[in-house]
C-alpha cells in the first residue's frame, strides 16, 4: 500500500546495490546467482553497462523478468578515448540520483570509472558507498607485454578507493598483497561452475565413436589464440580428429581463411555462438585452450565438470585448475608443434610415459578433473559471495548508524 500511495517515499526506503560492467551480457552470463543472493537479502539490484555493446550472448533478453533495473552508461574499452569522461559523468549522475548501499564493479575500465565516480560522489556529498572490484584476471601478469603493465600504477592508485579487491587466481592474489587497499584483498575461486549429476565412471571409456572431437569454447579474438590450434591440426592429418570452436568474434574471417588455406575445411569447424555448450561438451573427447591470457577460465571449469581431459596453455589461471599429466597436459609456450605433440600423446594407443590405453587414460584424466573442479563450484563461490556481501553491507549499515 505504501508503494502505491507514496512511490517516491518507498523508492527512498528501498535498499539498492549497483553492479557495473563495461559491456552488456556479463551479469546474465556469469553473475545471476549473485544477483539472486542480493535480492534474497532484500536489495534491489541495478545494473550499469553499455547495453548497446552485447558481448556475452546475443542480446539483453536474459535480463527480462529478473527484476534487475538497467542503466545505460556509454563505457569504452580504451582508457585514452574521449568517451571515458562521458561515461564517468553519466555514472556520477546516476550515483547522485540513487542512494546505493554498495557498488560492485567488474572489468578493468568499468572498474576504473566506477571507483573514480564513487570517490567523486563522496567528495561532493560526504556519502561513502562501499566499492567492490572483481579483477577477472589482472592485465599485468607474468609474461605480459610491457604495455599491459601500464595498468599496474592505475590499479595500485585505485586500491585506496576499493573496499574489497576480489581476485580469482593465486598469481593475482600474491601480486596485489602490497597494494594500499582501503579494505582488504579477497580470493574467490572465479564465478563458479555448476556441477552436473554424477555419471557412470566408465561412460567416456565406452565411447568408441570416430572421429575423435577436440573442442574449444571462447570468443574468436587474438587473446584466445585459436589460430595456434588450427596450425596444430595441420600437423595431425594422420589422426582421425575433428576440431570445433564455439564462439564469435572479430577474428572469424581470418580464422576461416586460414582453415581454407590449410585445406582443413572438413576437419576444423567454426560453430559460432552456442547456448547449449553442455551438449557440445558431452560429444567432445578433449577440451583445448591455447589462450595467451586468462583469469580463471569458465570454459575450462565447464569442461572439467563434464569429465573431459584438457590440453591448455601453461598460464595464470589455467594452471590453477589443471594439474599436468593428471587432468590433461599444460603446454609451455605457443608453438603449434608442441600442441600437436600433446594431442598425439592424448590420442595414440600408448606413449613413453604410460602403458595405459588411450581411452582409459583420457577417462582417468576426466575423472580427476571432475573431482578437482568441486572446489570451484557455484555452491562454494555462492557461499563465499553471500558471506562477503553480508560483511560489506553490515559494515556500511553500522557506519550509517554512527553518522
Model-derived features: where do they sit?
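Short His-centered aromatic/hydrophobic patch
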Residues: 105-111
Amino acid at each position: 500500500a505504501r508503494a502505491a500511495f507514496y512511490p517516491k517515499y518507498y523508492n527512498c526506503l528501498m535498499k539498492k546495490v549497483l553492479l557495473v560492467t563495461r559491456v552488456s551480457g556479463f551479469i546474465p552470463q556469469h553473475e545471476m546467482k549473485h544477483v539472486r543472493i542480493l535480492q534474497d537479502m532484500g536489495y534491489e539490484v541495478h545494473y550499469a553497462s553499455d547495453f548497446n555493446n552485447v558481448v556475452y550472448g546475443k542480446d539483453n533478453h536474459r535480463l527480462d523478468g529478473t527484476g534487475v533495473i538497467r542503466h545505460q552508461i556509454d563505457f569504452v574499452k580504451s582508457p585514452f578515448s574521449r568517451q571515458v569522461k562521458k561515461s564517468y559523468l553519466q555514472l556520477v549522475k546516476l550515483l547522485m540520483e540513487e542512494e546505493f548501499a554498495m557498488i560492485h564493479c567488474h572489468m578493468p575500465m568499468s572498474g576504473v570509472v566506477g571507483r573514480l565516480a564513487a570517490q567523486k560522489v563522496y567528495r561532493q556529498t560526504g556519502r561513502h558507498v562501499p566499492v567492490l572490484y572483481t579483477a577477472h584476471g589482472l592485465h599485468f601478469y607474468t609474461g605480459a607485454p610491457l604495455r599491459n603493465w601500464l595498468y599496474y600504477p592505475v590499479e595500485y592508485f585505485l586500491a585506496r578507493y576499493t573496499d574489497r579487491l576480489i581476485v580469482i587466481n593465486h598469481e593475482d592474489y600474491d601480486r596485489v598483497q602490497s597494494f594500499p587497499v582501503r579494505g582488504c584483498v579477497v580470493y574467490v575461486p572465479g564465478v563458479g561452475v555448476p556441477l552436473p549429476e554424477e555419471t557412470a565412471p566408465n561412460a567416456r571409456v565406452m565411447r568408441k565413436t570416430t572421429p575423435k572431437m577436440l573442442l574449444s569454447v571462447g570468443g574468436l579474438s587474438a587473446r584466445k589464440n585459436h589460430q595456434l590450434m588450427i596450425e596444430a591440426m595441420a600437423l595431425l592429418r594422420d589422426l582421425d580428429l575433428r576440431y570445433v570452436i564455439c564462439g564469435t568474434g572479430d577474428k572469424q574471417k581470418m580464422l576461416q581463411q586460414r582453415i581454407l588455406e590449410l585445406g582443413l575445411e572438413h576437419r576444423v569447424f567454426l560453430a559460432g555462438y552456442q547456448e547449449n555448450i553442455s551438449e557440445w561438451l558431452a560429444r567432445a573427447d578433449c577440451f583445448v585452450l591455447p589462450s595467451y591470457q586468462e583469469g580463471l577460465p569458465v570454459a575450462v571449469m565447464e569442461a572439467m565438470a563434464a569429465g573431459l581431459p584438457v590440453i591448455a596453455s601453461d598460464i595464470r589461471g589455467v594452471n590453477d585448475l589443471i594439474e599436468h599429466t593428471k587432468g590433461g597436459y599444460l603446454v609451455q609456450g605457443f608453438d603449434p608443434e608442441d600442441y600437436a605433440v600433446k594431442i598425439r600423446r592424448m590420442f595414440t594407443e600408448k606413449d613413453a610415459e604410460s602403458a595405459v590405453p588411450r581411452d582409459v587414460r583420457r577417462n582417468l584424466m576426466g575423472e580427476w578433473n571432475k573431482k578437482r573442479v568441486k572446489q570451484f563450484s557455484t555452491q562454494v563461490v555462492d557461499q563465499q559471495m553471500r558471506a562477503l556481501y553480508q560483511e560489506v553491507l553490515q559494515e556500511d549499515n553500522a557506519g550509517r548508524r554512527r553518522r
